[in-house]
């Protein structure tokens, strides 16, 4: 097995992030992991625009992710950030109506290179994000994974409830069909 390492997304690691996204056609139709950064009315749905937006956010320090590297190649990421950085979440209206605690951080997207799937890299990337959050003084962290209830699902961009439970998160409540709110405090 390879020896994986985590690096924070930054201008210095942009090329690694971009390489991974490009190998997968910008990810999910050219999203470039920008979906949660913008509200629907602000979206262009254009891969080149999304790439430019993501790069600008990285350069401005407003996009965060734990990048997993195998040697010099980025092979996975876990996106995280404050609710201000990542305002767009699925089932937001329901989420806000039932909000009891405003988190310091959100984990919104986990992506693994197709060549590296089923090797535990989602968990490695999630732990990498939690470690980076701890380095930034921690706080309340929420994730919004799919609650698959043991069923197979082809797209799991925000991880699974089981993945988050194994990382020490607690189930808070459901959020729309098939999704839930998970929470953990990182010291």
Question: What name fits each language-model region?
Answer:
Residues 126, 133-153:
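Conserved GNAT acetyl-CoA-binding A-motif
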Residues 47-67, 83-88, 106:
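A short helix-loop-beta-strand connector motif used in the catalytic cores of GNAT acetyltransferases and
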Residues 1-38:
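Conserved N-terminal entry element of GNAT/NAT acetyltransferase domains
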Residues 69, 73-113, 117, 151-158:
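Conserved acyl-donor/pantetheine-binding loop and adjacent beta-alpha core of acyl/acetyltransferases
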Residues 26-59:
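Aromatic- and Gly/Pro-rich amphipathic surface segment
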Residues 107-112, 118-134:
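Conserved acetyl-CoA-binding loop-helix of GNAT-fold acetyltransferases
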Residues 155-161, 165-168, 172-187:
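C-terminal "cap" of GNAT-fold acetyltransferases
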């Amino acid at each position: 097995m390879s020896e994986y390492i985590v690096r924070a997304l930054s201008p210095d690691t942009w090329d690694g992030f971009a390489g991974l996204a490009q190998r997968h056609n910008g990810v999910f139709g050219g999203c470039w992991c920008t979906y949660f950064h913008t509200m629907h009315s602000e979206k262009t749905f254009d891969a080149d625009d999304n790439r430019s937006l993501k790069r600008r956010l990285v350069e401005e320090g407003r996009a965060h992710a734990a990048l997993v590297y195998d040697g010099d190649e980025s092979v996975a990421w876990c996106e995280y950030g404050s609710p201000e950085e990542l305002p767009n979440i699925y089932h937001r209206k329901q989420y806000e109506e039932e909000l009891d605690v405003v988190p310091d951080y959100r984990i919104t997207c986990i992506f693994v290179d197709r060549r590296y799937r089923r090797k535990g890299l989602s968990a490695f990337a999630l732990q990498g994000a939690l470690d980076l959050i701890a380095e930034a003084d921690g706080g309340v962290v929420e994730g919004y994974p799919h609650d698959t209830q043991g069923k197979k699902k082809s797209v799991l961009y925000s991880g699974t409830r089981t993945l988050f439970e194994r990382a020490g998160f607690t189930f808070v409540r459901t959020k729309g069909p098939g999704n839930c709110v998970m929470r953990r405090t990182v010291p």
